[in-house]
Amino acid sequence: MDESEFRVKRSSPTSIAHQPLALVNARLIDPAHLRETMGGVLVVDGLIRDFGAAIMPANLPAHARIIDCGGDCVAPGLIDMWAFIGEPGAEHRETIATATLAAAAGGITTIVARPDTNPPVDEAAVVDFLLRRARDTGRVRLLPLAALTAGLDGAEIAEIGLLQLAGAVAFSDGARAIRNARVMRRVLQYARDFDALVIHYAEDRDLAGEGVMNEGEFASRLGLAGIAREAEAIMLDRDIRLVNLTGARYHAALVTTALSLDIIAKAKADGLAVTCATSINHLTLNENDIGDYRTFLKLAPPLRHEDERRALVAALESGLIDAVVSDHNPQDVETKRLPFTEAEDGAIGLETMLSAGLRLVHSGEIPLARLIAAMTIRPAEILDLPQGRLKIGAPGDLIRFDPDEPFVVDPAKLHSRCKNTPFDEARMEGKVKLTMVAGGIVYEAE
């Protein structure tokens, strides 16, 4: 595979250490303060040295590389808290190399990888493998989630302390809910003792049953079994009650219904250490987009009614929803070109998360700074990471993008190994032009 085809560059450690880099004449998005100003950013030795209106060519070191952004937006690199990377065990779907290529092209500088791989990330050796592979083959930062239970079987608690020491950023069983409430209570207690964050996929699988899309009139018209929104809410409500009992830190991986939002709102009002995310798909698409059984829009959780989508957008705008994720889940052609009931769940999203989110900005539903905050500073705060902010001393993970540049999503040009995008041939606005990690350019559009 010819790397030049992807217009992606490996960072040179020498250039990071010795050549300052400045992005000038930019529309700076400061997500911590929900503020936009014109100015620039200076990165030295991989860290933000300064930013603001005073960053202009006349005030920079003589040997600095200067990039004139021509009024484009500059923001912290995006942090995606929920992505499936096939390595190890499903490299035919995605590898760290291909996923981080896609991420760099989409403005994502930190990927948080799900643990439901083969083998699962339930031993320190697997965490170490992922971190080494990311160093050797990755273009952006990759942080592994480790399992809550051994083998992801929902029974025996994993060695959370050892996994944390090995480098796991948080703990989850991936797209599997822990059914047993007693086990979940013990998991939360154990995680609390290590101040570890629990990220849980809330779904009552018994209630969801054989459902393949959102329960309702549209599912009935298509003749497909539905999944009641209560399947999410019941499990989430149980989890929040257990958080209240244990005092653990809890993050709902994906909330997709107004019922769930009510539960989250009450938990936050009660002072519990609870946060939540939703996917860019659930913010920008609804069940009607499935149309004539489009399997690329068969997702888990399923796309919901338009009223639910609007409730999610309102919750994002208010700050009730903390983070927006790609829910990247590559599936190959053989598992998607099947009848809807037989097709696998999931869609790719690393490369389109930002541009899809900008649809909400262009429609007037969300301010740009609020959208960027949900993809940068809030995930960083939840995971206790130094990146995701415009701040002196923060890592020089930055992106430059034109929020108004139009393009059509061409699956053949996407960098992911699989092409199951829900935005196939969709018209978008918002192109990433440059991505930096630790002060080094890892992607630059031609």
Regions found by a protein language model. Give the residues of each.
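Active-site mouth loops of central-metabolism enzymes
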Residues: 81-94, 115, 143-156, 225-229
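Histidine/acidic residue-rich metal-binding segments in metalloenzymes
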Residues: 155-324
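Metal-associated gating/positioning segment near the N- to mid-region
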Residues: 70-134
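Histidine-rich, glycine-flanked metal-binding segment
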Residues: 2-21, 28-77
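His/Asp/Glu-enriched, well-ordered alpha-helical/loop segment
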Residues: 221-249, 317-318, 322-323, 329-404
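C-terminal cap of metal-dependent C-N hydrolases
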Residues: 339-342, 395-446
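Divalent metal-coordination and catalytic microenvironments
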Residues: 26, 41, 46, 71, ...
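Alpha-helix-loop-beta-strand connector modules within alpha/beta enzyme cores
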Residues: 124-141, 189-200, 352
